[in-house]
Amino acid sequence: MSHQHTTQTSGQGMLERVFKLREHGTTARTEVIAGFTTFLTMVYIVFVNPQILGVAGMDTSAVFVTTCLIAAFGSIMMGLFANLPVALAPAMGLNAFFAFVVVQAMGLPWQVGMGAIFWGAIGLLLLTIFRVRYWMIANIPVSLRVGITSGIGLFIGMMGLKNAGVIVANPETLVSIGNLTSHSVLLGILGFFIIAILASRNIHAAVLVSIVVTTLLGWMLGDVHYNGIVSAPPSVMTVVGHVDLAGSFNLGLAGVIFSFMLVNLFDSSGTLIGVTDKAGLADEKGKFPRMKQALYVDSISSVTGSFIGTSSVTAYIESSSGVSVGGRTGLTAVVVGLLFLLVIFLSPLAGMVPGYAAAGALIYVGVLMTSSLARVNWQDLTESVPAFITAVMMPFSFSITEGIALGFISYCVMKIGTGRLRDLSPCVIIVALLFILKIVFIDAH
């Protein structure tokens, strides 16, 4: 009995030393509950990411495992080195950009696309090392940041509607409505509304519940074949190490590489600031403890992710669900990471999820990201016009890169044209000029 008590006490002492629970006004029990809560809100990524990367021709079973592995790696590293209640996983939006644009639309092999992700992550790591990253966040205006986030939201939403069959290609009108009497379309729509209704009622596992319900209904209708629940993890060798560094290191992909880097920069940094602020860890300027360590973990996770065969890794805003139930330290993130490791043994379940079950999650994430347009000052046309152009050009040009490029250029045009040169930071001018050079010397040839 005394031995058991001693072991328990030493375990608690170790947790206290590593995570400083008392200092943060929390307990191990609270942190574990917070970890479970965050995990339930973001575990949908292990079902959705393989579906999306599968479009690029990647082995979905292997991607399921690598998604779990990189989510575990990033989350555990964030917990141990930055002691923050923030979990990481492959980014929604950038996975769609990789699969639908870089591979499908541009016709590049997925190995080259992974190379572009790698170089973008290396760029992000260098910006972090030389402390340029926070300078860029501080000097790029809210309207452009919001335009980028919202544009990716519209792009993801469009992909979700397409995957559900709600919209289909039409040579005369570009797109038109699909067959709304088809059971797969109806299940895709149902999946989205299940998420939206449950999320509005503050049910953290809304996306997971939707995927389970629509998959079960698909099974009842004969679309889904039961393959068991637990099995040994499938081989990952079809995707691990298949990154084409030489093929992706060329000027023609400069815009794509820059897009991966810039979007990840805003996405992760914005999430880290938002979650730490909600946890009461950030100051009035948005700075939080161990910020440098957090940014390093984020960058290194993306580099690692590209090598093992998954898209750009980012901090997840779903981490705020764990914070809302008391998560304050890295123990929350470590719990999330350990749970992702356990999920690896549930690969047969991931193989059963039909495309329309994942489509609802895509549309919902699109809604969440597009809602940030509310932060734009619509009364100031020098801010609202670039935000609008950035957002709408992503789905309409079918390219996140073009949306970012036209957003930065239009921001400079509006500020110069109205004589408000003081609003232009060197950062915005440099990025706009780089995109102009890309359009003139690369895209034109």
Swiss-Prot record:
Pfam family membership, one: Xan_ur_permease
Cellular localization per UniProt: Cell inner membrane
Intramembrane intervals: 382-417
Effect of residue 298 to E: Almost no change in activity
Claim: Cell membrane is one of the keywords in the record: yes
Annotated keywords: Cell inner membrane, Cell membrane, Membrane, Transmembrane, Transmembrane helix, Transport
Gene Ontology BP terms: adenine transport
Outcome when changing residue 267 to E: Strong decrease in activity
Annotated phenotype, changing residue 91 to G/S: Almost no change in activity
GO molecular function: adenine transmembrane transporter activity; solute:proton symporter activity
Regulation of catalytic or functional activity: Internal adenine may inhibit transport.
Effect the entry attributes to changing residue 319 to A/N: Almost no change in activity
The keyword Cell inner membrane belongs to this UniProt entry's keyword annotation: yes
PANTHER family for the chain: XANTHINE/URACIL PERMEASE C887.17-RELATED (PTHR43337), XANTHINE_URACIL PERMEASE C887.17-RELATED (PTHR43337:SF1)
Family from the record: Belongs to the nucleobase:cation symporter-2 (NCS2) (TC 2.A.40) family. Azg-like subfamily.
Protein name, per record: Adenine permease AdeP
